[in-house]
Design a protein with these regions (language model features):
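A short helix-to-beta-strand connector/capping loop
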Residues: 54, 82-92
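Conserved beta-strand termini and adjacent loop/short-helix elements that scaffold enzyme active sites
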Residues: 27-28, 94-98
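C-terminal anion-handling pockets and recognition modules
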Residues: 90-92, 99, 103-152
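Electropositive, glycine- and tryptophan-enriched low-complexity nucleic-acid-binding patches
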Residues: 1-53
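Short, conserved catalytic/metal-binding motifs centered on acidic residues
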Residues: 5-6, 41, 60-61, 104-107, ...
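Aromatic-rich, lipid-facing transmembrane alpha helices and their immediate juxtamembrane interface loops
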Residues: 48-51, 73, 78, 93
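Short, aromatic/basic amphipathic alpha-helical patches
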Residues: 68-84
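Acidic/histidine-rich, metal-coordinating catalytic segments
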Residues: 53-67, 96, 104
Length: 152
């Protein structure tokens, strides 16, 4: 099982402009691949739309499913559609240098979360693990993204 995540930072419009963070997570049964990455991006953009956000800034490591031609092509087509229709938010990928996870804002969140979900006395089922992760990050448990049969 794999997990895709976006750490969303919101700034309140109140007098103090306090930021708060939300984790948006989707689990995958199997390995992450480009087709799943594009589905996750589409889902993320759909969630951002009601908030009136105009861009999704992605801080990404160099995983192959982040850098693939399929993903880059999908992002380019998505951004073209946003520009042509004036609806939605563009995606701005910001690739990190190789072997530099400390530059990714979501990494400390993952590290702290991992320690809270493990069960020292037994292995957790995939569903139990996903539910615990969602409880720690206070996010809804969404249906798992499916790996298309042709790439499985």
């Amino acid at each position: 099982m794999a997990c895709y995540g976006v750490l969303v930072r919101w700034w309140d419009r109140g007098p103090y402009h306090d930021p708060h963070e939300e984790a948006w997570l989707r689990f995958v049964d199997g390995r992450p691949v480009s087709a799943i990455t594009t589905r996750f991006l589409e889902w993320s953009c759909t969630k951002l739309a009601p908030a009136g956000k105009t861009a999704l800034l992605l801080v990404w490591d160099n995983a192959s499913w982040h850098l693939s031609h399929e993903v880059r092509r999908w992002i380019k087509a998505h951004n073209r559609h946003v520009r042509q229709t004036g609806r939605g938010g563009r995606i701005v990928p910001c690739p990190l240098p190789i072997k530099s996870p400390w530059l990714n804002p979501i990494e400390p969140t993952w590290v702290h979360g991992k320690g809270k979900v493990v069960a020292p006395d037994r292995l957790l089922s995939a569903r139990e693990l996903a539910q615990r992760v969602c409880a720690v990050f206070r996010c809804p448990y969404e249906p798992h993204l499916a790996v298309p049969k042709k790439v499985a």
